A protein has these predicted regions:
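OB-fold and OB-like beta-barrel modules that bind single-stranded nucleic acids
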Residues: 16-20, 76-83
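Short, basic/aromatic beta-hairpin or loop at an interaction surface
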Residues: 47-57
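Structural detector for short beta-strands of small beta-barrel domains
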Residues: 8-47
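Short nucleic-acid-contacting surface segments enriched for D/E, G, S/T with interspersed K/R
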Residues: 11, 60-79
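Polybasic, proline/glycine-rich intrinsically disordered low-complexity segments
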Residues: 51-53, 73-75, 112-115
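OB-fold/S1-family single-stranded nucleic acid-binding modules
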Residues: 44-46, 81-115
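Generic detection of short hydrophobic beta-strand segments and adjacent strand-loop junctions
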Residues: 14, 18, 56-63
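Transition segments tied to proteolytic processing and entry into folded domains
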Residues: 1-7
Length: 115
């Protein structure tokens, strides 16, 4: 499903499970900055409160780079808020509202979360 399926959860706290597929720096020159959201984490096979979604991107500070690299290719579970954001539609250059997540809980493996 697409991220528009997250619309009913707008501004609400949800449980997110997914597999960390890729971790990278948004800007490699800012890798020593502590406050910028510079780490991009790609989650695949995501389930947000029972709704299946293909993929989601998490934007985190640099301290999460090492943690996410340890958890790469593992299923993780955490709580998050669904937040709306605007992006540019490449076909006609209009702003389109889409939905993403902002992490509120810690990134832990799904097995550790259940225990």
């Amino acid at each position: 499903m697409t991220r528009s399926a997250l619309k009913p959860f707008k501004n609400k706290r949800v449980m997110v499970t997914g597999r960390i597929h890729r971790v990278l720096f948004k800007n490699y020159l800012d890798r020593h900055s502590t406050f910028k959201p510079n780490v991009r984490i790609l989650l695949k096979d995501v389930i947000v409160s029972g709704v299946s979604i293909d993929h989601l991107w998490l934007y985190e500070t640099n301290k999460y780079y090492a943690l996410a690299m340890e958890l790469i290719h593992q299923r993780v579970k955490f709580s998050a808020n669904v937040v709306p954001y605007y992006k540019i539609n490449r076909n006609n250059n209009l702003f389109v509202q889409d939905y993403g997540i902002k992490r509120k809980g810690n990134l832990v493996t799904e097995e550790a979360y259940i225990q």
